[in-house]
Each structure stands twice: as structure tokens, then as C-alpha cells.
């Protein structure tokens, strides 16, 4: 793994380079897209980005859990959780990149 985290600024810079908007417009575009995704999720809507992923809010029922130290049963309150499900296209891209890196490591004799 590269260990790099892609930030909003990185996304805006990429839009700036690839689309040709100004840096300010690129940053505003990235913020608008993120805001729209967040607003839809807050409203309880699913956000499906084809070939990327689906973001959803799910309701979890109350259930009984267990304290791992004491073994005592503990009630877990009902709650809402957000889920991210990668598309098959994204999963395949990740797998292909992983296999490609491993093949290069074998050729050069390096391992991670």
C-alpha cells in the first residue's frame, strides 16, 4: 500500500488539471459534490455511483452484546449506521492493481 490519503484538496487539484476549471471553481465543485452526497445520506437516501460504490444508511435493531472482558450480556441500543459497498467494477480494479504490484515485486525480488 502506498499509505497516501487522498484529500479534498487532492481531488480539487485533479479536477483543476483534468477539467480546466480554475482552482477555486474546482474546489467549489468538489465541495458541492460532497455536500450533495452527504445531504442525500442524511435524508436517508441511498447514493449509488455506478462503477464505484453505494452509500446507504441502515437501521440496526436493539440486540444483546457481550462485554469481552467480563462475559456479561449488555444491551446494544438501536442505531443508524452508514454503509459503503464497493461495486464489482471497483473491486476488480483493486484486485487487478494488487496482482500487478505483486507480479512486479516478484520480478524485482522485492516483497512487502
Swiss-Prot record:
Gene3D superfamilies: IHF-like DNA-binding proteins (4.10.520.10). One of its GO terms (biological process) is DNA recombination. It holds the Pfam family Bac_DNA_binding. InterPro entries: Hist_DNA-bd (IPR000119), Histone-like_DNA-bd_CS (IPR020816), IHF-like_DNA-bd_dom_sf (IPR010992), IHF_alpha (IPR005684). One of its GO terms (cellular component) is cytosol. The keyword Transmembrane helix does not apply. GO terms for molecular function: DNA binding; structural constituent of chromatin. Keywords: DNA recombination, DNA-binding, Transcription, Transcription regulation, Translation regulation. The keyword Transcription applies. PROSITE patterns: HISTONE_LIKE. This protein is one of the two subunits of integration host factor, a specific DNA-binding protein that functions in genetic recombination as well as in transcriptional and translational control. Belongs to the bacterial histone-like protein family. Heterodimer of an alpha and a beta chain. This is Integration host factor subunit alpha.
Amino acid at each position: 500500500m502506498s499509505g497516501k490519503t487522498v484529500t479534498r484538496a487532492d481531488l480539487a487539484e485533479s479536477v483543476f488539471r483534468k477539467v480546466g476549471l480554475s482552482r477555486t471553481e474546482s474546489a467549489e465543485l468538489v465541495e458541492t459534490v460532497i455536500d450533495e452526497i452527504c445531504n442525500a445520506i442524511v435524508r436517508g437516501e441511498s447514493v449509488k455511483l455506478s462503477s464505484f460504490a453505494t452509500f446507504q444508511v441502515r437501521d440496526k435493531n436493539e440486540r444483546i452484546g457481550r462485554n469481552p472482558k467480563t462475559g456479561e450480556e449488555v444491551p446494544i441500543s438501536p442505531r443508524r449506521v452508514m454503509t459503503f459497498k464497493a461495486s464489482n467494477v471497483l473491486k476488480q480494479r483493486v484486485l487487478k492493481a494488487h496482482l500487478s504490484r505483486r507480479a512486479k515485486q516478484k520480478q524485482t525480488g522485492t516483497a512487502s
